[in-house]
Structures are given as structure tokens and as C-alpha cells.
Curated annotation (Swiss-Prot):
One of its GO terms (biological process) is response to ethylene. InterPro entries: GAGA-bd_tscrpt_act. Residues 138-158 have a biased composition (Basic residues). Keywords: DNA-binding, Nucleus, Transcription, Transcription regulation. Transcriptional regulator that specifically binds to GA-rich elements (GAGA-repeats) present in regulatory sequences of genes involved in developmental processes. This is Barley B recombinant-like protein C. Belongs to the BBR/BPC family.
Length: 290
């Protein structure tokens, strides 16, 4: 007893004394503080193991502080601490189901919307049915409109009708030219027959040469070439037949020449030199000699 009195005076508790657990654990408060009137005496009296455990020496252990309410409930039941609020009245499985871990939703990063796929990629290939005959494409319009050409036989020529005498028909005779018409010309009140006028000449080369008759009373020159003529003529690069470069004089132009010579008193029975009249009355042409 003295020992107990001395120890109590020193503030120490005796070993045989009833141990009162501290109101709070040493830095291991798992739950919020509970008032003293809410003690679980009915649990201690009902369970002999728990009642006996309160008489045992309590040795605090340093445990890491749990970070979730589920861990708090399991640690309280494992250590036999009666500070839990109402956990002793429920089975452990029900407590774990009530305090399941509910993960907090994590914010998801919003990705930019992907561009829509082109329509060509989204189109699925057409379904091909089996045992369906494939029709060939229709021919082109040109081929439809055209028809194969059919060579028509040539019609035979009609035979020539036989003559009345029974002789075979002769070949057609070549066409002959009719006689030239005598063209008269009235010069200064005198009727002049041009067919009786002598052939015209030209002395452009130094020697008088005859002219060729052209048309009705007209004349053309054959000596007035590009080399020897005083009045050069163009050369034909593509001569055809007997065509040559020369000068010609129409019937009306030649009539003017005759009127001028008759007014001057020229004798028209003499050949007329047309050298001085080509430049004024003649024209350069590609003519054909007949």
C-alpha cells in the first residue's frame, strides 16, 4: 500500500490498479472525438473476450495514419478499440460494403474533334449477289446509230440502140467549130470589116512580129516577154498547157486604137504596129495560144 501511495504521489500508476485508457491515443486518432456517454458498455459486457481485453496492458503502436475511411474502420475493429461509432453492431462484411472505395472521377482531357472522314471512305462496296448474270455495258451511241455499209451493185449501162440499117452505132464525132462571124465596126461613119484588116504587128524586140488574134477582134502579144520586151511581163510559175505570159487587147480597146488612127489619117490597109498602144490599152494576162 505504501508503494502504491508513493507511486500515486509521484504521479505514477500502480501495476495492480485498474488501467484507464487515455481519452485519446498518442497521435493515432482514427475517428473524430466521441462523447463519453456514447460508450459501448453493452458490447463489453456481451463479449467476454473484449471484457477481459480491457484488463490487459495496452501498449500503443505507431501505425501509419490511414488515408481512407475504409482503412479507419478496419483498423478500429482489428485493434479492439471501442471508439468506433456503431461499427461493433454491424458485421464486418456489411461495414466493408458500406465503406467501399469510391474513386473520384478524374478530369478527362478534351481532345479536339477529329475531322469527318470523306464520303468516299465511308461508302461501303456494293453487295454483289451470287448467281446474278452481269450485263455488259450498252454500246456507244455512235455504234448504235451506224449500220454496216452494204455495197450496192452498179447498174449496168444501157446498150446503145442499134441503127435502123442494123449497123453497130459509131462513136460520137468530135465537135467542130463553126465559121467565124464577120464582125463589123463603124469607125467615123465608115463600116469596117475587121476580118479584112491585115495582121497586127509589134516591134518591141526591134523586128516586127505578128500578133496573135484573140477573141472577137482582139489581139495578144507573144514577144513581150520578161527578157526581150521593152515592157516586161510576169512569168507564170505554174504554166498549164500552152499558156504563156503576154499582153492582150480587147475588142473595145482595139476599136479605140482604130478610131485614133483613122482620125490621124492612117491607112488601115497597112499592118498596125501596136508597140505604142500596149501600155495604155493592153493588159497583162496569161493567155493561151490557139
Amino acid at each position: 500500500m505504501n508503494d502504491d501511495a508513493s507511486m500515486s504521489s509521484m504521479g505514477l500508476r500502480g501495476w495492480g490498479a485498474f488501467y484507464e485508457p487515455p481519452a485519446r491515443n498518442l497521435g493515432l486518432q482514427l475517428m473524430s472525438s466521441v462523447p463519453a456517454d456514447r460508450d459501448t458498455k453493452h458490447l463489453l459486457s456481451a463479449t467476454p473476450f473484449l471484457h477481459h481485453h480491457q484488463h490487459q496492458q495496452y501498449v500503443p503502436h505507431h501505425h501509419h495514419q490511414p488515408h481512407h475511411p475504409r482503412d479507419c474502420g478496419t483498423n478500429a475493429n482489428a485493434n479492439g478499440n471501442g471508439n468506433g461509432v456503431g461499427y461493433g453492431m454491424m458485421p464486418a462484411t456489411h461495414t466493408l460494403r458500406m465503406l467501399q472505395h469510391q474513386p473520384e472521377p478524374q478530369p478527362q482531357l478534351q481532345h479536339p474533334p477529329s475531322p469527318p472522314h470523306p464520303k468516299e471512305e465511308c461508302i461501303s462496296p456494293p453487295l454483289m449477289e451470287e448467281n446474278v448474270p452481269v450485263k455488259p455495258p450498252p454500246p456507244k451511241k455512235r455504234q448504235q446509230g451506224r449500220q454496216p455499209k452494204v455495197l450496192r451493185p452498179k447498174k449496168p449501162k444501157k446498150p446503145a440502140a442499134p441503127c435502123e440499117d442494123g449497123a453497130p452505132p459509131s462513136a460520137p464525132a468530135p465537135r467542130r467549130r463553126g465559121p467565124r462571124k464577120n464582125i463589123g465596126m463603124v469607125i467615123n461613119g465608115i463600116d469596117l470589116d475587121l476580118s479584112r484588116i491585115p495582121t497586127r504587128i509589134c516591134s518591141c524586140t526591134g523586128a516586127p512580129q505578128q500578133r496573135y488574134r484573140w477573141g472577137a477582134g482582139g489581139w495578144q502579144s507573144a514577144c513581150c516577154t520578161t527578157t526581150v520586151s521593152t515592157y516586161p511581163l510576169p512569168m507564170s510559175m505554174k504554166p498549164r498547157g500552152a499558156r504563156i505570159a503576154g499582153r492582150k487587147m480587147s475588142h473595145g480597146a482595139f476599136k479605140k486604137v482604130l478610131e485614133k488612127l483613122a482620125s490621124e489619117g492612117y491607112n488601115l490597109n497597112n499592118p498596125i504596129d501596136l508597140k505604142t498602144f500596149w501600155a495604155k490599152h493592153g493588159t497583162n494576162k496569161f493567155v493561151t495560144i490557139r
